Design a protein with these regions (language model features):
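Active-site environment of divalent metal-dependent phosphoester hydrolases
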Residues: 111-113, 176-178, 227-233, 253-256
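Extracytoplasmic/secreted proteins, especially bacterial periplasmic and envelope-associated proteins
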Residues: 65-69, 73-76, 82, 86, ...
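Metal-dependent polysaccharide deacetylase catalytic core of the NodB/CE4 family, i.e.
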Residues: 45, 49-51, 57, 100-102, ...
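N-terminal pre-catalytic segment of deacetylase/amide-hydrolase enzymes
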Residues: 12-102, 264, 268-273, 288
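Alpha-helical scaffolding within the catalytic cores
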Residues: 87-90, 113-117, 145-165, 251-255
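N-terminal Lys/Arg-rich, disordered targeting/topogenic segments
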Residues: 1-9
């Protein structure tokens, strides 16, 4: 039955393509339809902090105005923000994705995401994935701060955003987000046995899952690798903990197919400050 539905959808799409380009361009249009049937290209945009202070802007910090401009550009150009559940449904049972899907992500769980990104997403009809560092969420839940410069979201803020239906909470480890110690992110140490590494990584990520379950009512299905670092054997460990979607920091567009493995290590484009929305999306999304 599914094959019949797919064939019907393909024929309808092909007919539309023929009408759109005329007889001269029929062959090229049909090739495009064949390519589209092999999966869906899903660009992923990666943000971190959003701060309304020109002195703080840089590679990992954009201004509220830049973020709103990005959301407006995506809306104006026909993109629809999706979440993990949309990708999983497409892979598992063929539920169609929007014509131009985009996955918007925020790493680390800063309070300024709640302050600026959350209301902006509501205004522009966007959705996004926010992947907090579990330990930071615990710290700022115990001692809340509303400083847009350094504070992180509390569990209550994450719950509010999640319950709105436009924000998905991911896992960014509990306490493996350091770049100034012996271990970079989740990287395995040279002196560490695979058995010890598996135990360490599993304990940390599982703790973040448990904290989310206790405070949000559900455990994340998406894992964002800190710094994009992945050690040998790590993907298997992460998969064993129940994640269906994982995010890298590689600048590329991923093609999502009916193969569950197509949801692993999705490419992402880091959004820096100092570039117009038009220039950034032309550079990263191209013709997608």
């Amino acid at each position: 039955m599914y094959g019949v539905v797919n064939l019907k959808r393909w024929l309808q799409t092909a007919a539309t393509a023929v009408l759109a380009v005329g007889a001269i361009g029929v062959f090229g249009a049909l090739l495009t339809v064949f390519a589209a049937d092999g999966g869906v290209q899903v660009p992923v945009i990666m943000y971190h902090a959003v701060i309304d202070d020109s002195r703080r802007l840089g590679q990992y910090v954009v201004s509220p105005a830049e973020l709103e401009s990005d959301f407006a550009w995506l809306q104006r150009n026909g993109y629809t923000a999706v979440l993990s559940e949309d990708l999983i449904r497409y892979v598992e049972d063929g539920t169609p994705l929007p014509e131009k899907p985009v996955l918007i992500t925020f790493d680390d769980g800063y309070y300024n995401n709640y302050l600026y990104a959350y209301p902006a997403a509501r205004r522009y009809g966007m959705k996004f994935v926010l992947s907090p560092i579990g330990k930071c969420t615990d710290l700022y839940t115990a001692e809340p701060s509303e400083s847009p410069y350094y504070a992180h979201c509390t569990w209550a803020m994450l719950r509010e955003m999640q319950d709105s239906g436009i924000v998905e909470i991911g896992n960014h480890t509990y306490d493996l987000h350091s770049s100034d110690g012996a271990r970079l992110g989740t990287r395995r140490l040279a002196s560490e046995s695979m058995e010890d590494y598996r135990a360490m990584l599993s304990a940390d990520v599982r703790l973040a899952q448990e904290k989310a379950g206790q405070n949000l009512g559900r455990a994340p299905v998406l894992f964002a690798y800190p710094f994009g670092v992945v050690s040998e054997g790590e993907p298997e460990i992460i998969a064993s903990l129940g994640f269906s979607v994982t995010l890298s920091c590689e600048a590329r567009i991923s093609t999502v197919t009916r193969d569950p493995e197509s949801l692993l290590y999705l490419g992402r484009f880091l959004r820096p400050s100092g570039e117009t929305s038009e220039a950034f999306f032309a550079r990263t999304l191209g013709a997608v």
